[in-house]
A protein has these predicted regions:
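Conserved alpha/beta-hydrolase "acid-adjacent" motif
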Residues: 128-134
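Short beta-strand/loop motif that positions the catalytic acidic residue
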Residues: 115, 121-123
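Serine-hydrolase catalytic machinery in alpha/beta-hydrolase-like enzymes
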Residues: 1-65
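Structural detector of well-ordered beta-strand residues that form the stable sheet scaffold
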Residues: 22, 99-100, 120
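C-terminal catalytic histidine-bearing segment of alpha/beta-hydrolase fold enzymes
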Residues: 139
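Short N-terminal helix/helix-N-cap motif within the alpha/beta-hydrolase-1
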Residues: 4-8, 31, 83, 110, ...
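Glycine-rich His-Gly loop
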Residues: 1-2, 79, 104, 124-125
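Primarily recognizes the serine-hydrolase "nucleophile elbow" in alpha/beta-hydrolase
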Residues: 57-116
Length: 139
């Protein structure tokens, strides 16, 4: 949905707590967050998912390489951002140190074997769709 006010506030709070915080706007190629989540969601569906994934992996490497970084990378994501957290945990086994996806589907099953980082997965107890997805992860 883009870099909405809530995500900006989460990044602000993490930075205030002393972390290097980075909150990219996946909608940047389309002009950025449009001001409401529904329009942002519609815009997101027009983007190239592979390019977005590659951009987030590049951002993760960039953050880990910063002089003031301790080399550890944690990620928090909501909805599509939750998927990105799952993807970062699975695309390269040592990229992510820990992740907290709030909803967000798991990455491709072929990548599950790469997951080494602990994930604190946030889901609604009665949400059957996501429970099916988690069974694939053996969670």
């Amino acid at each position: 949905r883009g870099l909405n006010p809530y995500v900006k506030d989460v990044a602000r709070r993490l930075a205030k707590a002393g972390f290097i915080a980075f909150a990219p706007d996946a909608l940047h190629p389309l002009g950025g967050y449009p001001g409401n989540d529904d329009e942002g969601r519609a815009m997101q569906h027009t983007l190239d998912r592979t390019k977005i994934q590659n951009d987030f992996v590049a951002a993760a490497h960039f953050l880990k390489a910063q002089p003031n970084s301790n080399g550890k990378l944690g990620a928090v994501g909501f909805c599509f951002g939750g998927y990105i957290v799952n993807y970062l945990a699975s695309v390269e086994s040592n990229l992510l140190t820990a992740g907290v996806p709030f909803y967000g589907t798991p990455a491709s099953e072929s990548l599950h074997k790469n997951i080494k980082a602990p994930l604190m997965i946030q889901l609604g107890e009665l949400d059957k769709e996501y429970k099916r997805e988690l069974k694939k992860l053996k969670v």
